[in-house]
C-alpha cells in the first residue's frame, strides 16, 4: 500500500512561505537599523522570531555570522565603544534579552554623513523585543540603567584581540544616563574620538 502525501506549495517554493512581520526602523546612521520583533503569546508565554534570512537579504543585512556572545552586566556598568578593525571588521546584531539599558551606536566611517555622530535608545526587555543592527564601521556601547542587563550578540567575523578597537566612552559627546559608571580598565584606555584614525570608508 502506497501513501500519497500532498506537499504544500510553500514547501516547494520557499518564496511562498509567510514572512515574519518584523518592524524595520531606520536610524539617522546609514545602514544602522532597529528591528522590532512581534511576539506570539499564549498561556505558556511567548514566541518570537529574530532572524529570517530571506527578509534580511532583502534588507541588505548580513546573513553570515561567525560567533554569538552573551554578556551579563550589573547596575551601573558601561561597556564601549567597541568595534573591530580590518581585516576582522564586523557587522553586528545586538539584542537585550533581560533587564534595562541605554544602547548607543557611533558612526566611525570616513565620508559618512553622520561620521562622529551617535544614536541612542532606551531598552527594556519587559516592554518590547528589539535589536540593533550595526554595519561595519559603527561602534557599539551601552550602560545598564536597571538592576542588570543580559545582551546577546551575533557578529560576522571571529573575535580577534589584535583587531579589537574602539573609542573612549567620554569622548564622543554622549550624555550617558548613569553617574560614576563601572568601566573596565581596557575601555578606559581607548583612544578619544579626536585621536581615532578610522580605517573605515563609508559606502553609500
Residue ranges and their predicted role:
Residues 2-128, 147-148, 155-204:
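Non-catalytic, conserved peripheral segments adjacent to functional cores
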Amino acid at each position: 500500500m502506497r501513501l500519497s502525501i500532498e506537499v504544500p506549495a510553500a514547501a516547494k517554493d520557499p518564496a511562498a512561505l509567510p514572512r515574519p512581520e518584523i518592524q524595520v526602523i531606520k536610524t539617522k546612521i546609514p545602514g544602522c537599523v532597529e528591528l522590532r520583533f512581534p511576539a506570539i503569546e499564549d498561556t505558556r508565554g511567548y514566541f518570537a522570531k529574530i532572524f529570517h534570512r530571506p527578509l534580511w537579504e532583502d534588507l541588505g543585512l548580513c546573513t553570515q555570522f561567525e560567533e554569538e556572545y552573551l554578556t551579563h552586566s550589573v547596575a551601573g556598568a558601561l561597556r564601549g565603544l567597541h568595534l573591530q578593525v580590518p581585516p576582522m571588521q564586523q557587522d553586528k546584531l545586538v539584542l537585550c534579552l533581560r533587564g534595562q539599558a541605554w544602547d548607543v551606536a557611533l558612526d566611525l566611517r570616513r565620508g559618512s554623513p553622520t561620521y562622529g555622530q551617535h544614536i541612542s535608545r532606551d531598552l527594556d526587555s519587559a516592554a518590547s523585543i528589539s535589536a540593533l543592527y550595526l554595519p561595519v564601521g559603527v561602534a557599539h556601547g551601552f550602560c545598564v540603567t536597571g538592576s542588570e542587563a543580559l545582551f546577546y550578540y551575533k557578529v560576522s567575523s571571529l573575535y580577534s584581540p589584535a583587531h579589537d578597537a574602539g573609542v573612549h566612552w567620554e569622548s564622543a559627546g554622549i550624555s550617558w544616563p548613569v553617574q560614576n559608571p563601572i568601566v573596565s580598565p581596557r575601555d578606559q584606555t581607548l583612544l578619544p574620538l579626536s585621536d581615532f584614525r578610522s580605517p573605515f570608508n563609508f559606502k553609500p
